[in-house]
């Protein structure tokens, strides 16, 4: 992205993780396009903007207010397993920071497991207990529209009841295999709700998560902008590797595309 914006020389694109090349995590001392915060140690990218906002509040109250600004962090769901994140959330100094927004990339995959569904319930409760404003962007506009049709309530209930491991496994299938696995054990009403869909349309529906839908994200961000008395966190449901051949594959962490896959992806773009 930085290269496309003209902020990074093309030569760096071929030197990822090399000595003198781009780091695997943002670094203010090593990257040529200095980021706002260095990360590397998991959890720092979440906590640093939060305490920066607290510092900004102190500066404004003691030395005069500056133009309004926002402090935004994009973090992974497995990053919420880090203890320093919750220390920052619970710190009294970070309360009532209405100019803070965290966006959690909730793809349910970490390096070595699929995140259990119960975790989102626990995390939401922890944020709310600390006084945060919480939004879940779970479904895209296609699924939301489908839920409003006949048997849509049953369809939504069926998807909501699925374990993360079960739902995650669907992304690796297409055609009749996807339909069979998706409807396995489902009430008859769920089958009726998708009966008229082609296999391709069913795949697009099942994978229509809110984190990939710009309209759903815009709506959530607008709500966060209106909440000015506390920090906000947005859980954006996504598919790891979305749009790529390894999308949703449990072994896709740091996976590389083959030459043929890159050529196909380039043609699709």
Task: For the regions a language model picked out, list residue spans one by one.
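A general structural motif
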Residues: 68, 97-99, 229-231
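Long, well-ordered, tryptophan-enriched scaffold segments
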Residues: 106-269
């Amino acid at each position: 992205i930085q290269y496309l914006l003209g902020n990074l020389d093309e030569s760096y694109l071929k030197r990822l993780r090399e000595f003198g090349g781009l780091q695997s995590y943002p670094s203010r001392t090593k990257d040529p396009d200095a980021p706002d915060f260095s990360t590397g140690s998991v959890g720092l990218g979440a906590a640093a903007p939060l305490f920066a906002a607290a510092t900004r509040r102190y500066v404004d109250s003691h030395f005069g207010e500056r133009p309004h600004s926002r402090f935004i962090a994009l973090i992974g769901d497995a990053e919420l397993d880090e203890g320093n994140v919750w220390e920052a959330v619970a710190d009294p100094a970070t309360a009532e920071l209405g100019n803070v927004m965290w966006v959690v990339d909730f793809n349910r995959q970490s390096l070595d497991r699929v995140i259990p569904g119960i975790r989102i319930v626990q995390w939401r409760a922890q944020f709310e207990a600390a006084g945060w404003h919480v939004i879940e962007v779970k479904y895209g506009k296609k699924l939301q529209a489908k839920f409003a049709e006949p048997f849509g309530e049953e369809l939504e209930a069926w998807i909501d009841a699925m374990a993360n491991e079960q739902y995650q496994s669907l992304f690796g299938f297409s055609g009749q295999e996807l339909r069979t696995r998706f409807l396995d054990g489902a009430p008859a009403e769920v089958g009726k709700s998708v009966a008229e869909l082609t296999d391709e349309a069913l795949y697009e529906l099942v994978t229509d998560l809110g984190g990939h839908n710009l309209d759903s994200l815009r709506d959530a961000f607008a709500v966060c902008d209106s909440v000015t008395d506390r920090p906000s966190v947005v859980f954006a449901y996504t598919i790891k590797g979305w749009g790529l051949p390894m999308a949703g594959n449990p072994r896709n962490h740091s996976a590389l595309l083959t030459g043929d896959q890159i050529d196909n992806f380039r043609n699709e773009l």
